[in-house]
Regions:
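Substrate-gating cap/lid alpha-helix
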Residues: 299-321
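Alpha-helical transmembrane signal-anchor/signal-peptide segments
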Residues: 52-75
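Hydrophobic membrane-insertion alpha-helices, especially the h-region
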Residues: 28-52
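N-terminal Lys/Arg-rich, disordered targeting/topogenic segments
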Residues: 1-30
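Secreted/periplasmic serine-hydrolase-like ester/acetyl group-modifying domain
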Residues: 150-288
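Membrane-embedded segments
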Residues: 82, 86-175
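Loop/turn elements at helix/coil->beta-strand transitions in domains of secreted/extracellular proteins
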Residues: 76-78, 101-103, 127-130, 286-293
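Second-shell loop/turn segments in exported
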Residues: 81, 106-108, 264-271, 281, ...
């Protein structure tokens, strides 16, 4: 950086020069730009080919902005699906439209608690439609501060606070995410790839099991579909999907810093509070002529045995109804 010679006033009173010149180096800028563009294109194409080679394909990212776009599609008389991944994957919008005469709006989310969305719809004075709520007790009765509750709360918060820039960004992302496989945010980021390194956990570490990578696609209506490889009998991906749920739903041991009886009492109190809050939300919806249908979707084998043991029907489902 080359500065001009200080003026007489600056020499007397001090202070740096107020102007400077920065000469541009005489290098082949056009050629350098072409090289950079070629490197970026080559790297992008190579990464895309690699992602497709390991099984990935183009799909929309399930984020708060996409959820918000569907939430905005809810009309006063809409049929709305809320809850967890069972209501997300197990319900086909085309078939429901044929049977119900109206196309539902899909607001269920993987690993999410349906209560924040239920409460938000209850507060919407204009809504008097029908809610189909998927219930997995461990998720639906999750206390505040847990990941299932936070997923629902973040989505509802984004609906009420989404900026025009965030909304425009989601619309601009559609054509790219529908064509490019490596834009899978939740699985192909550097942070996620580092977590996949086969490094053994230290002794006594309580690390949650990792979900299988890329087994479903998502469209602009948030319809979730499993990829074809999931249907191949005996495939590694199918086995991983089948075997992940028991360790994922197995509760961790109670904390050692509090007596077990006291801990269980707090859990019971939290569930009781959730029953009370659900009752208030349902009464608001009923008072406007709306309907709500609670559904437990089919599950079997070891997962059903685990859920029946940890969240028995008599303590969760029956009181809910």
């Amino acid at each position: 950086m080359f500065f001009r010679k200080p003026s007489r006033a600056e020499q007397i009173h001090g202070g740096p020069p107020l102007e400077f010149e920065r000469p541009i180096p005489p290098v082949p800028w056009r050629g350098m730009a072409v090289v950079v563009v070629l490197v970026v294109i080559t790297a992008s194409v190579g990464w895309e080919l690699y992602c497709r080679a390991i099984g990935y394909g183009p799909t929309l990212n399930d984020n708060e902005d996409l959820w918000t776009l569907r939430r905005r599609a809810v009309t006063p008389e809409s049929i709305v699906i809320i809850g967890d991944s069972r209501g997300w994957f197990d319900l086909d919008l085309d078939e429901l439209q044929k049977g119900l005469g109206k196309r539902p709006v899909q607001l269920a989310m993987g690993g999410g608690c349906g209560y924040p969305v239920l409460a938000d719809l209850a507060k919407d004075e204009s809504f008097h439609g029908t809610i189909i709520c998927s219930v997995v007790p461990r998720l639906f009765f999750a206390p505040p501060g847990t990941p299932p509750m936070e997923r629902g709360e973040k989505a509802v918060k984004r609906f009420h606070s989404q900026t025009p820039a965030q909304r425009a960004s989601q619309y601009l992302a559609f054509p790219l995410e529908e064509q490019v496989a490596f834009l899978k945010q939740e699985e192909l980021t550097l942070d996620d790839l580092l977590k996949r390194l086969p490094i053994p956990n230290r002794a006594g570490a309580r690390v949650p099991p990792r979900l299988p990578p890329y087994f479903g696609t998502l469209d602009s209506e948030r319809r979730a579909r499993m990829i074809e490889e999931c249907a191949l009998p005996g495939s590694e991906l199918a086995q991983r999907i089948q075997q992940i749920w028991i360790p994922l739903f197995t509760p961790p041991p109670p904390p050692s810093y509090i007596p077990k009886e006291q801990f269980m009492a707090k859990i019971g109190e939290a569930i009781g509070n959730r029953f009370r809050d659900i009752t208030i939300a349902v009464e608001k919806i009923h008072s406007r002529g709306g309907k709500i249908v609670f559904v437990r979707f089919p599950h079997s084998g070891g997962l059903k045995e685990l859920e029946d043991r940890e969240t028995p029907r008599a303590k969760t489902w029956d009181p809910l109804l």
